[in-house]
Amino acid sequence: MALKSSKAVSEEQHGYEFFGPPGAFAISFLLPVLVYVFNFVCNDISGCPAPSLLSPKTLSLDKLKQEVGWPQDGFAGLVSWEASAATAGYILLSLILYRVLPAHEVEGTELRSGGRLKYRLNTLYSSSFTLAILAAGTAAQGAEFPVWTFISDNFIQILTANTIFSYAVATFVYVRSFSVKPGNKENRELAAGGHTGNMLYDWFIGRELNPRVVIPLIGEVDLKEWLELRPGMMGWIIFNCSWCAQQYRNYGYVTDSSICITLVQAVYVFDSWWNEPAILTTMDITTDGFGMMLAFGDIVWVPFVYSLQTRYLAVHPVSLGPVGLAVMLSLIGLGFYIFRSANSEKNNFRTNPNDPKVSQLKYIQTKKGSKLLISGWWGIARHINYLGDWIQSWPYCLPTGLAGYQILNAGAQAEGALVMRDGREVVQGEAKGWGMLITYFYILYFAILLIHRERRDDDKCHRKYGEDWEKYRKIVRYRIIPGIY
């Protein structure tokens, strides 16, 4: 649903981002390969990383394939009808719940055309309903609940199904974007940076700003907003729970480290669902087009990369103990407090500047009419919320310790080995520390992501506000980390 207004805003100048077409190609076709590498190299067959990778001089492709569990029928084994059907069913369930469960409608920010789009928000209800079904199944059947065993048995094939889906969605919205006409009554718009004329880049970055489709029996769905918070974020929690169940099947217990990561990540996800209206003011919704970048990120990258730590712990359990657990919870509490307080302050100021909670905040009145906060959280750093977000990433990775393990055959009787129920033994051995390249990848990646997003936002705001933004930067000097950066 769209609301019209007579006001219109001219399109800002916009150049290439992500190093233009070469960067778009690399991200679109190499990142999916990286996800497969992570999930093959760190496995429950031979180790994390696969032992052959620690001895490159004697490395052979045939031996590596055996160690990582490469399908016997090659690339064809990466796909299965069962995993594809399960993925389709999961997406269909999410769409049905989006339509049938109660929701409240919220207007988005003003578009360049002067209109506003309406959004149907009920992610918290639909996701809670799904989790309730999974909880009931787990209560009845424990770690052998078929959903958990299906995920662990078909994980690579599920990854393939979701990857294909992300490519399909990106291609569909790109082709459909050519039907956008100026002044259309649906308030369809092209993204400012998404129609450069380079097909690959526009497909990657997203040509249409807010693509919407009408699905039979479901109704209108805003693809970008729906995918941002639903299948991928929900999948993140589901995968974590699946790996906790796998750890229980392997050892007969679930460690505090697995529980800690699963719970703190669930809190992060539930917070985004609880504050779903706030997403409508983010760069993803207001500025970026919807293309391969967001489709792959939402559908594949988030659930399959963000759950790497619990997948690791399913094979190599780590006990934090009371002190370690307290440190992890303190970090997540600090990060969450900064992240949510800063975002709430900004959102409250934008939606109701007369609210007593934010009415005392100082700001710069720009020539464009917008107000730039220079006190409160946003007077400390231009993106202080990113600092909180990054701090929250530490407890996701730290519980894995000096990661790395090797899996030995049953009866090896290795000293200090963890013994699985099937008799196989897990030791760190020469792999100790090397697994950190995988389990700590998230901290490094997330730092790069946040720095890049801040730079993009800074460039966008400088183009938009000009001298006012330069004045703002002199007052609020630091970008993300006060006193450092």
Swiss-Prot record:
One of its GO terms (molecular function) is NADP binding. It catalyses: 4,4-dimethyl-5alpha-cholesta-8,24-dien-3beta-ol + NADP(+) = 4,4-dimethyl-5alpha-cholesta-8,14,24-trien-3beta-ol + NADPH + H(+). NADP(+) binds at residues 346, 350, 373, 378, 385-386, 457, 461-465, 472. It is a multi-pass membrane protein. GO terms for cellular component: endoplasmic reticulum membrane. Keywords: Lipid biosynthesis, Lipid metabolism, Membrane, NADP, Oxidoreductase, Steroid biosynthesis, Steroid metabolism, Sterol biosynthesis, Sterol metabolism, Transmembrane, Transmembrane helix. It is found in: Membrane. Its EC number is 1.3.1.70. Belongs to the ERG4/ERG24 family. It holds the Pfam family ERG4_ERG24. It comes from Fusarium vanettenii (Neocosmospora pisi). The chain crosses the membrane at residues 18-38, 77-97, 131-151, 155-175, 319-339, 431-451. This is Delta(14)-sterol reductase.
